[in-house]
Amino acid sequence: MNLAKRILQGEQLTKETVLKIYEDTNIDTLDLLNEAYILRKHYFGKKVKLNMILNAKSGICPENCGYCGQSREIKQKQRYALIPEEQIIDGAKVAHDNHIGTYCIVMSGRGPSDKEVDHISNTVRTIKSQHPQLKICACLGLTNDEQAKKLKSAGVDRYNHNINTSENYHDNVVTTHSYKDRTDTIELMKANNISPCSGVICGMGESNQDIVDMAFALKEMDADSIPINFLHPIKGTKFGSMDDLTPMKCLRIVALFRLINPTKEIRIAGGREVNLRSLQPLALKAANSIFVGDYLITGGQPNQLDYDMINDLGFEIDYDTCENKENKNDVSRAN
């Protein structure tokens, strides 16, 4: 194939070429993953960036996203309003102590009120005064220009708003907002010099063409960070009984995203434990970033298992991206 060599030499793969490669059963997934690894190693070496999520507001949402346990369709769910500043600040210390590079503050809902943006902004200022090198990613939903400016001024480094699926498949996933609402939010953040983070959820019944379209959409959007989530079916949601993924399919998806977005931070995110299972380590041959700890309403695996996974691969935590560089051997033992 020599795909990686061709990409490093400047070749721009077309959607048609990538779809043909992705669907070719004669191309072994591990061979495709090896091509992705050449690119991953070229741009990121063997380093792995660590991220941590805090669910700062839960279950209060008017949207009908078919994958989400916090949507309006779910009656039995964990609900609480925006938590106090002190709890968010405490979470930042946990992130710092665990060698996390990016601390992600997430709120449920269509978008934040001005009061909520002020609350988050004040909190971020305090966090930055205590942990100036800890990167802050906000995920608050649809925002306006004034809110984006407040977040930037407070010290928010990155803003996450996932496209989740392809434009063509979007209305099968959610109808209470549009695909354009999501892409406009990312463009607004870029206009305010906030690093754009946008990714996908795979396994919701999308086609192979949709998967390719998602990867190219994020390339065209120029997202700095791309989280790849794998559907973790939640009872009561539209996709609660969906079973469309295998570990090898997940690996093939991650490899494809690396081939199309060779220089970007690609993160294996929600659902990796239940969908990749014993093949989780192989995903880091293409991805260079993971979430550590729990997700929004589903649990992750113990932190030490992630540290061991990184170490067992012969990889290392990317300490260049985290503030806490002390006691490295506590989390990643020398090979």
UniProtKB/Swiss-Prot annotation:
Residues holding [4Fe-4S] cluster: C61, C65, C68
GO molecular function, a single term: 4 iron, 4 sulfur cluster binding
Taxonomy, superkingdom: Bacteria
Catalytic activity: (4R,5S)-dethiobiotin + (sulfur carrier)-SH + 2 reduced [2Fe-2S]-[ferredoxin] + 2 S-adenosyl-L-methionine = (sulfur carrier)-H + biotin + 2 5'-deoxyadenosine + 2 L-methionine + 2 oxidized [2Fe-2S]-[ferredoxin]
E.C. designation(s): 2.8.1.6
Family matches, as InterPro entries: Aldolase_TIM, BATS_dom, Biotin_synth/BioAB, Biotin_synthase, Elp3/MiaA/NifB-like_rSAM, rSAM
Protein name listed in UniProt: Biotin synthase
Cofactor note: Binds 1 [4Fe-4S] cluster. The cluster is coordinated with 3 cysteines and an exchangeable S-adenosyl-L-methionine.
Family: Belongs to the radical SAM superfamily. Biotin synthase family.
Binding, [2Fe-2S] cluster: C104, C137, C197, R267
Keyword annotations from UniProtKB, A to Z: 2Fe-2S, 4Fe-4S, Biotin biosynthesis, Iron, Iron-sulfur, Metal-binding, S-adenosyl-L-methionine, Transferase
Radical SAM core domain location: 43-269
GO biological process: biotin biosynthetic process
Entry cofactors: [4Fe-4S] cluster; [2Fe-2S] cluster
Subunit comment: Homodimer.
Pathway annotation: Cofactor biosynthesis; biotin biosynthesis; biotin from 7,8-diaminononanoate: step 2/2
Gene name for this UniProt entry: bioB
The keyword GTP-binding appears for this protein: no
